[in-house]
C-alpha cells in the first residue's frame, strides 16, 4: 500500500515561502532582508493559490521561491549584516554608559564595509548582460545626480552619482555613440548604441526639486548603491576597451566653478592624448605607398604629355570609379503600398562629423548641460557660453568672430524695450558684451530644438525654420514612426487629405455657422404676444369639439398634401435631367462667347460653382458606394474566420482614419486662422 503524503510537503506549499518565514530562516532584520534581495535580484512571487501555498495567507502576504531563499543562506553579505547588527549593539551599550568617545571610535574603526563586486559578477556573467541592464541604472543615477541634498539624500551620494554619470557621458562623447534624443514632459530621453546594444535612459530637467516624504529613500538608496557599483564596472570596461585610463583625472577647482564635463581630463594608457587612441593610426607603410604612388603618377603624367595622349583620352568615355565608403545602405520602398523597412541609424563617423565644423555659443537662458553633451557627442569641439553658466567654455566672449551658431531661447522684442549694455562692460573690459536682442552679422541664430531635430534626422536642417521668435515645427519622438493611414505632422495636408475632404470640412463649418446664426432669433414683440393671448382667450381654456365641416376640411387638406407629395417625387426625379440641361446650356453659351471673342460672364457664377461642388460630392458618394458594394461581394466569397478577421482589421483602420481626420481638421483650422491673421 502506498504511503499517504502529508500536507505541505509538495506542490505550492513546498515551492513558496512567506516573507516572515524567510526573515526568520536567514536570521536578519526586515530592512537587511530587503537590501539583500535588491542586491541579489530576488523579487516576490505570486502563487496560483495562496491558500495552498500557506494556510494563514492573506491578500497582503508576500511570497518568495523557497529555492531563492535557500540560495541566500550561502551569501557572504549575511555575515556583514550580522557584524553590523553586533556593532550596533556595542555602540548602543556605550551610549547607554555615557561613553560617547568609545561609541564614535567603534563606528569609525570597526564599521564593516560592504563590497558588491562578487554580486555584480554573479548577476552579469558577460559584459553584454550588464549593458542590457543599464537603462534603469542610468535613469536612477541621473535622477539622484540632480536632486538637492537632504537628510535622506546626503551630498556624498549626489557627488558619486554625478561623477559616474559624467564619466559615462565622456565615453559617449569620445566614441560618438549617442544616436537619438527627445524632449518630453518627463525629461530628456537619450539613446546610445554600445557594442550593438541600444541603451535608453531618462534625464530630468534641472528644475528646483521638492523632496516629498512619501518616497521611501532607503529603498532607492539601496538601488543607488548597487547601480553605482555596476556603472563603475561598466565604465572601467568601456574605458579600457578604447585605451583610456580609468578613472579619469578630476579637477576639483573646475567642478566648483560649474565646469561639469570640462572638469574631467581623459588620458590614454600610453603617453599621448585620448583622441589619438580613438583615431585609426596611419601606418608608415601607408605613408610610403602614398609617396611612391605620387612619384609614379608624376612620371605617368609626363609620359602622357610627351606622347600627346591627352586628347585621345578625353575623347574616350572613362568609367568613374565609385568611392568606397562606410556609409550605411538605405532601403527605399519600390511601391507606395509596399512595407516600409526600418532604416538603420547613422554610423559613428557620421555622428562625429555632424557639428564638427561649427563653433557654438549657448545663451544664458538656454539649457547648457544637455546642449553641451549633445554637441560634443556629435563632433563639436568649440562651445562657448556666458560666465554665469560656469567655467570650462571655449570662449566667454559673445562677440567672438569665430562663433558660427548661437543658440537662443528668448522671444524677439523691439529694440526700445531692450536694456542697454552696462557701462562697466563698455570700458574696455576683458569680455566684450553684445547688446541684448541684437544680432551679430554672419552668425546663425537658432532655438535649442534645432539641435535635437538635427541629430534625430541625421542631417543639418534649415536654420530659418528655428529662428528666434519663429513658430517651431513639431518635435516628434524619433522612436515612433507614422503608421499607414495615420496622421503625420511632418507631412503637408495636401499629401494626407482624401479626395474632397477639405470641401466636406468647409461645408460642415458653414452649416455649423448657419445653425448658430439661426439659433440667435429675435425676441418676440409685445404685439405678437398680445395676438397670441387673444387667440388663447377665444378658447377660454375649454376643449371645443370639431364639427363635420372641420372634418371635411381636414380630409381635403390631407388629399392635397398627398398630391403635392407626388409632385415632389416627380420633381426629384427630374432634377438630374434639369442639371444636365443646365450644364449643356452653359457649355453652349461659353462656346458662343468664345467664337465672338467676348469674355463669358454669367450672373449665376456662384450657383455654377455650388452645382459643380454638388456634382463632385455625388460622384464621390457614388464611387464610395461602388467600392463598398465590391467589398461586400468579396466578403461573400470568404470563409467565416477570414471574414471576421477582415472586419476587425477594417474596424481598427476606421478608428485610425477617424482620429487622423480629426487631427487634420484641427490642423486645417489652425492654419486657416494663422493665414487670416
Swiss-Prot record:
Protein name: Pescadillo homolog
Gene that encodes the chain: nop7
Region (Disordered): 472-677
Lineage: Eukaryota, Fungi, Dikarya, Ascomycota, Pezizomycotina
UniProt GO MF annotations: ribonucleoprotein complex binding; RNA binding
Coiled coil: 609-650
GO biological process, any: maturation of LSU-rRNA from tricistronic rRNA transcript (SSU-rRNA, 5.8S rRNA, LSU-rRNA)
Residue ranges of domain BRCT in the record: 359-468
CC terms in the record's Gene Ontology section: nucleoplasm; PeBoW complex; preribosome, large subunit precursor
Keywords: Coiled coil, Nucleus, Ribosome biogenesis, rRNA processing
UniProt organism field: Emericella nidulans (strain FGSC A4 / ATCC 38163 / CBS 112.46 / NRRL 194 / M139) (Aspergillus nidulans)
Amino acid at each position: 500500500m502506498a504511503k499517504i503524503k502529508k500536507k505541505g510537503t509538495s506542490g505550492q506549499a513546498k515551492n513558496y515561502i512567506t516573507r516572515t518565514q524567510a526573515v526568520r530562516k536567514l536570521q536578519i532584520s526586515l530592512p537587511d532582508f530587503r537590501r539583500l534581495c535588491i542586491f541579489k535580484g530576488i523579487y516576490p512571487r505570486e502563487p496560483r493559490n495562496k491558500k495552498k501555498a500557506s494556510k494563514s495567507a492573506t491578500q497582503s502576504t508576500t511570497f518568495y521561491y523557497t529555492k531563492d531563499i535557500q540560495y541566500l543562506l550561502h551569501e557572504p553579505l549575511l555575515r556583514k549584516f550580522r557584524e553590523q547588527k553586533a556593532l550596533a549593539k556595542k555602540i548602543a551599550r556605550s551610549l547607554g554608559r555615557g561613553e560617547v568617545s568609545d561609541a564614535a571610535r567603534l563606528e569609525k574603526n570597526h564599521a564593516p564595509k560592504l563590497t558588491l563586486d562578487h554580486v555584480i559578477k554573479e548577476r552579469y556573467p558577460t559584459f553584454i548582460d550588464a549593458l542590457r541592464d543599464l537603462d534603469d541604472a542610468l535613469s536612477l543615477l541621473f535622477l539622484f545626480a540632480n536632486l538637492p541634498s537632504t537628510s535622506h539624500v546626503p551630498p556624498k551620494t549626489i557627488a558619486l552619482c554625478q561623477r559616474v554619470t559624467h564619466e559615462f557621458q565622456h565615453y559617449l562623447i569620445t566614441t560618438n555613440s549617442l544616436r537619438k534624443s527627445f524632449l518630453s514632459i518627463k525629461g530628456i530621453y537619450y539613446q546610445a548604441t554600445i557594442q550593438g546594444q541600444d541603451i535608453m535612459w531618462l534625464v530630468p530637467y534641472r528644475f528646483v526639486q521638492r523632496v516629498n516624504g512619501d518616497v521611501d529613500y532607503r529603498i532607492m538608496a539601496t538601488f543607488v548603491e548597487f547601480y553605482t557599483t555596476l556603472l563603475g564596472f561598466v565604465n572601467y570596461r568601456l574605458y579600457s576597451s578604447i585605451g583610456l585610463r580609468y578613472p579619469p583625472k578630476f579637477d576639483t577647482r573646475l567642478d566648483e566653478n560649474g565646469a561639469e564635463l570640462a572638469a574631467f581630463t581623459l588620458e590614454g594608457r600610453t603617453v599621448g592624448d585620448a583622441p589619438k587612441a580613438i583615431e585609426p593610426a596611419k601606418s608608415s607603410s601607408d605613408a610610403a605607398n602614398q609617396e611612391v604612388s605620387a612619384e609614379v603618377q608624376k612620371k605617368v603624367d609626363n609620359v602622357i604629355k610627351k606622347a600627346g595622349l591627352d586628347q585621345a583620352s578625353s575623347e574616350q568615355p572613362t568609367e568613374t570609379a565609385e568611392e568606397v565608403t562606410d556609409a550605411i545602405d538605405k532601403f527605399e520602398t519600390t511601391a507606395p503600398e509596399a512595407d516600409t523597412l526600418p532604416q538603420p541609424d547613422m554610423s559613428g563617423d557620421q555622428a562625429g562629423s555632424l557639428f564638427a565644423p561649427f563653433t557654438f555659443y549657448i545663451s544664458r537662458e538656454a539649457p547648457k548641460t544637455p546642449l553641451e553633451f549633445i554637441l560634443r557627442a556629435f563632433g563639436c569641439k568649440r562651445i562657448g557660453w556666458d560666465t554665469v553658466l560656469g567655467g570650462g567654455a571655449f570662449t566667454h566672449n559673445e562677440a567672438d568672430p569665430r562663433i558660427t551658431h548661437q543658440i537662443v531661447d528668448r522671444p524677439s522684442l523691439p529694440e526700445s524695450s531692450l536694456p542697454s549694455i552696462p557701462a562697466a562692460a563698455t570700458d574696455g573690459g576683458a569680455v566684450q558684451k553684445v547688446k541684448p536682442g541684437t544680432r551679430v552679422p554672419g552668425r546663425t541664430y537658432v532655438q535649442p530644438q534645432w539641435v535635437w531635430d538635427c541629430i534625430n534626422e541625421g542631417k543639418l536642417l534649415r536654420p530659418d525654420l528655428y529662428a528666434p521668435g519663429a513658430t517651431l515645427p513639431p518635435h516628434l519622438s524619433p522612436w515612433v514612426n507614422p503608421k499607414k493611414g495615420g496622421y503625420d505632422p511632418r507631412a503637408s495636408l495636401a499629401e494626407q487629405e482624401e479626395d474632397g475632404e477639405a470641401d466636406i470640412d468647409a461645408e460642415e463649418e458653414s452649416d455649423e455657422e448657419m445653425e448658430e446664426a439661426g439659433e440667435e432669433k429675435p425676441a418676440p414683440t409685445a404685439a405678437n404676444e398680445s395676438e397670441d393671448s387673444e387667440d388663447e382667450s377665444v378658447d377660454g381654456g375649454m376643449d371645443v369639439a370639431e364639427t363635420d365641416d372641420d372634418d371635411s376640411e381636414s380630409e381635403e387638406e390631407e388629399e392635397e398634401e398627398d398630391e403635392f407629395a407626388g409632385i415632389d417625387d416627380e420633381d426629384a426625379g427630374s432634377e438630374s435631367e434639369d442639371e444636365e440641361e443646365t450644364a449643356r446650356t452653359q457649355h453652349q453659351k461659353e462656346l458662343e462667347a468664345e467664337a465672338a471673342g467676348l469674355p463669358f460672364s454669367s450672373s449665376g457664377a456662384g450657383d455654377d460653382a455650388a452645382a459643380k461642388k454638388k456634382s463632385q460630392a455625388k460622384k464621390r458618394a457614388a464611387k464610395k458606394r461602388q467600392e463598398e458594394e465590391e467589398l461586400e461581394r468579396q466578403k461573400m466569397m470568404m470563409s467565416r474566420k477570414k471574414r471576421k478577421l477582415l472586419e476587425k482589421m477594417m474596424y481598427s483602420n476606421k478608428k485610425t482614419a477617424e482620429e487622423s481626420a480629426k487631427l487634420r481638421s484641427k490642423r486645417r483650422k489652425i492654419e486657416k486662422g494663422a493665414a487670416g491673421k
